């Protein structure tokens, strides 16, 4: 289940990425049937091209997740070498003695799934990363009914996401962010607006685009991962961008600041992300100017507060 990477700590000089140790998988390759992927965040799919060079087995994932995986495989010239199968919510795949069902959940990336694993010993449920959102932007709330049905059948083990488990309360619906964007755009009608967010948060990007269209602004996109994910999401129908809304960053000079919204990476203060380079006057195309409205549309990941 999943095949992600992590990023190095500051003291890990010369290291760009940290990928899993696949020694066990290589030693037991006859037992490895497939990779089953819950969603398309880097810490869940980022290591796939590297690991598949050692353990080449089929991949099962939902549509957007598979689109992001395929983009990575293309970069590594591996697309033809890897068997892939797109799975719909409610659909199951059989892998040896196991049957794996994909269940719809909500997360900060579209097409996230939980996995119900039917084994000879009993049912195991792996939630993947999730939140309960009754009013998601894409109109597809988490399938709590299916979780309830599995609970009634009896679950041997639950492997559950525990992000923010120690914080009281609940996570607000992604849809509530839309009204915040509306206020920001309304309060900054004479400023260029620069919004940093996670590239993978397609629903967040959609709401930024909706606000830009409503206020008659053109949208520029900066940051390699942001450009890549927007391209994939739009091609697959997960992003709806009216014709003429997106412009190249070089074309900003043809518009006044109040006609522009810039969507960029760098919401976590990453030193090489587009926003950080803009702030340091190191970006080739954009620098932050007096009067710009800069919005961090994300919460700092624990440990990133200082960078932000």
Locations of regions flagged by a protein language model:
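Conserved acidic residues
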Residues: 33, 156, 260, 292-295
């Amino acid at each position: 289940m999943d095949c992600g990477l992590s990023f190095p700590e500051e003291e890990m000089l010369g290291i760009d990425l940290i990928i899993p140790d696949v020694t066990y998988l290589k030693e037991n390759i006859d037992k490895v049937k497939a990779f089953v992927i819950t969603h398309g965040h880097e810490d869940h799919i980022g290591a796939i091209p590297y690991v598949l060079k050692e353990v080449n087995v089929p991949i099962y994932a939902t549509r957007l997740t598979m689109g992001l995986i395929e983009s990575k495989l293309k970069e590594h010239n591996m697309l033809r070498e890897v068997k892939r199968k797109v799975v719909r919510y409610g659909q199951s795949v059989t892998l040896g003695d196991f049957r794996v069902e994909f269940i719809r959940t909500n997360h900060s990336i579209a097409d996230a799934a939980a996995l119900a694993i039917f084994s000879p010993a009993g049912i195991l449920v792996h939630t993947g990363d999730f939140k309960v959102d009754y009013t998601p932007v894409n109109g597809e709330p988490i399938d709590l009914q299916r979780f309830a049905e599995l609970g009634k059948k009896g679950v041997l083990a639950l492997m559950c996401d525990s992000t923010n488990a120690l914080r009281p309360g609940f996570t607000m619906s992604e849809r509530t962010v839309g009204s915040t964007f509306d206020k920001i755009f309304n309060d900054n009608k004479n400023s260029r607006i620069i919004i940093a967010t996670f590239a993978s948060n397609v629903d967040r990007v959609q709401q930024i685009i909706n606000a830009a269209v409503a206020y008659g602004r053109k949208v520029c996109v900066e940051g390699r991962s942001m450009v890549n994910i927007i391209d994939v999401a739009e091609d697959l129908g997960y992003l709806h961008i009216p014709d003429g809304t997106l412009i190249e960053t070089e074309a900003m000079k043809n518009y006044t600041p109040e006609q522009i919204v810039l969507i960029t990476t760098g919401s976590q203060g990453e030193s090489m992300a587009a926003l950080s380079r803009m702030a340091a006057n190191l970006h080739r195309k954009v620098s932050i100017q007096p009067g710009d409205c800069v919005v961090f549309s994300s919460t700092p990941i624990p440990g990133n507060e200082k960078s932000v």
